[in-house]
Each structure stands twice: as C-alpha cells, then as structure tokens.
Amino acid sequence: MKLIQKNIEKNGSGWITMCPEEPEDMWHLYNILQVGDQLKASTVRRVVKVGATGSTSGSRVVMKLRILVENMDFDTKAAQLHIKGRTTEYHPEVKMGSYHTLDLELHRNFTLYKNEWDAFALDRVDAACNPSRNAEIGAVVLDEGLANICLITDYMTILRQRIDQVIPRKRRGDSSAYQKGLDKFYDSVFQSINSEFDFDKLKVVILASPGFVARGLYDYIFSMAVKLDLKQIVKSKNKFVILHSSTGHIHSLNEILKDPAVESKLADTKYVQEIRVLNKFYDVMNEDDRKAWYGPNHVLKAFELGAIGELLISDSLFRSSDIATRKKWVSLVEGVKEINCPVYIFSSLHESGKQLDLLSGIAAILTYPVDEEDISEDEEDEESQNFEHS
C-alpha cells in the first residue's frame, strides 16, 4: 500500500488517502473499514442522456463518488473488496443519497474518512504501508496428482494455483504410463512455480508431501532449471526445503511450518511467530489449564486481575459492526501493551488464525494460575448485583 496523504485531527477524526498496490492490501482495507465510515473512490457508472428529440443515449463514465459505508464484502479468492453505501457528496450525474457499490481497484487512489481513527486502524495502515512487507514463503503442498501452490505473507495465505491431474496406476512389470503421468504432473507444477514465485524475494520455498512426491518434484525442478538455464531458480537452491506432510491439502501448512528446518529460516516473520505462540498456548493448556484461558469473558477477567502474560487475538474481532465492541478489543490490546506484554494479532486468513477463531478468536497465556471457580464466582457476584439493581 502506498500512503498518499494523511490528515488526522487531535480528536482522532480525519482522512487518509492511499493507493493499493497488491492483492493483500485489499485484506488490510477490509480490516480497517467500518460501517459508518465514508469512502471516496473512482468508479464507473452508466449515464443516460436524453436528446432534444427525446431519444436516449448511454455511456459509461468514470467518476469519483463519496459514500457512507453500509456493507462490505471481501472475496478471498479474487482478493477483491466491494463496499456498498449511499452517496454523501454532490455529483452532477448521481442523485444524492442513492445507493452505489464501490469496487476498489489496484493502483487507484481512494480516501477513507473516519470519525475516529483508533489505534488498531492506524497500526494496520502502518503495516500495510511498510515497504519491507512482501511474501516471504513460497509453498507447494502436494501428493500424487494434487498440488497447491501458495504464497504466504504476514497476513494472507494466497492460493496461486491448484493442480489436480489423474496419474495412471502402476502396473505390475510396466510403470511407464505411471512415470509419464507423474512427469507430466511435475512439469505442470514446475511451470506454475516458475511463473508465480519471485525466487529473489522469497526467503524459503517449501515442498511438502506424504511419501517421496516432494523429493521427486525437487529433482524435477532442478533438472529442468539446469536444462533451461533458469539462473534465478538454480541460485535459489539453498532456499528449498523438502518436508513431510500428512496430506497434499492446503490445511497441512500449519503442521508443515512447525518444522524446525522452516522455523530457523523464518524465525522473525509474523506468521511463524503466530504459529509458535499458538502452539505454546496449547502446550500450557495441556500442562496447567489454569494458566491458559480463552473466550471473551475469561480473557477480559484475566486482564482485570493483571494475569495476562501474552495475548492472542484474531483480527476478525475488530471487524465488529458494533462500535462499542470494537472499542472494547482496541482498549484491551492497548492495555496489555501498556504493561509491556506481547500482543499477537492473528490474521483470520491464515490457518493459525482460523484455529484461534475456533477458540472464539481470543486467548491468553497467564503469568500465574487462575482457577475457573474464581472467575465464575466473580461473574455470579456481578450478575447478583445487576439483579439487585434491577
């Protein structure tokens, strides 16, 4: 994302003009946008004009419209963002207050207006506009005839291509048809990664499969790279890591990225840090479940008790259309940061984020054990007081 201009008042209101430069930027915007914000962007509308004789003619006109955001839709596969709302600014070709859907496009500026730019939104803008942010992991998760070619960024796992081919079975005494089919499959995967991966920018390229399929692909890639004199691939040979996975499906990525061979190369990346702390949470919960809490009420109570050591929270919680709910999570994150405890904001588009969402989207590793009875008693006391007041 490119930051074009920024104007934030002391009370937190203001606007920011940005330009999305890659598909992941649309995911950032989806997390920044809220119902009630205003958005100004270029769009195309069909304008009908009536001539002097009563005849009509229509043409498609590019115009800038400003709308009050009522609804948002993010297409994860196409990485496209559609925002619906009523127009709030005069335009000679568009009736004020009419509904329109803005489809944000790459390399087209837009301006976002908010009554309050909270800490989460501003941090997300900073992350999106960080020039060092790029895809750092290329991954091929495969099995015989099936391959998922992925790019993994800090915030998204992008499935660039899925290859599904039928490979003939081995016949007793004759495996030529099988080998021919396997080589054809390997070649399809090779062509895909050659076009989808920028090997100069990637830190690591993972080939993972059950059995020896990944090893076979590795051998095929480098035999072809040498044969075709593809220097970019040849000089990136030390970036390739061959790993075992239980399946050839994309959900095996979490299991794959736990491997020490990958962790050592990607220790400083956001995605690997998220996987590591989520695994730590599960380990702590297995050892002493009084030191690992999840769920909104339990985590908020742990914060009140000053017991949070590490906070795990999904970005899905910040997409609440209820302003008070969003403020509650922003306040919690800021409060935990103020006591110098680490906060991990998981992307719900990563497998680790999806796992956290299954735990209600929020969890905490505590600095000391807290019995569930203590929290339950406090909740009962609060309910009793509320009943007495009512």
Swiss-Prot record:
One term of GO molecular function: GTPase regulator activity
Keyword NADP annotated: no
Compartment list: Cytoplasm
Any one GO CC term of the record: nucleus
GO biological processes: cell division; cytoplasmic translational termination; endoplasmic reticulum unfolded protein response; meiotic cell cycle; nonfunctional rRNA decay; nuclear-transcribed mRNA catabolic process, no-go decay; nuclear-transcribed mRNA catabolic process, non-stop decay; ribosome disassembly
The protein's required cofactors: a divalent metal cation
InterPro entries reported for this sequence: eFR1_2_sf, eRF1_1_Pelota, eRF1_2, eRF1_3, Pelota/DOM34_N, Ribosomal_eL30-like_sf, Transl-rel_pelota
Keywords recorded for this protein, A-Z: Cell cycle, Cell division, Cytoplasm, Meiosis, Metal-binding, Mitosis
Family recorded in the similarity comment: Belongs to the eukaryotic release factor 1 family. Pelota subfamily.
NCBIfam families given in the database record: pelota (TIGR00111)
Subunit structure: Component of the Dom34-Hbs1 complex, also named Pelota-HBS1L complex, composed of dom34 and hbs1.
Its job: Component of the Dom34-Hbs1 complex, a complex that recognizes stalled ribosomes and triggers the No-Go Decay (NGD) pathway. In the Dom34-Hbs1 complex, dom34 recognizes ribosomes stalled at the 3' end of an mRNA and engages stalled ribosomes by destabilizing mRNA in the mRNA channel. Following ribosome-binding, the Dom34-Hbs1 complex promotes the disassembly of stalled ribosomes, followed by degradation of damaged mRNAs as part of the NGD pathway.
PANTHER family, alphabetized: PELOTA, PROTEIN PELOTA HOMOLOG
Protein name from the UniProt record: Protein dom34
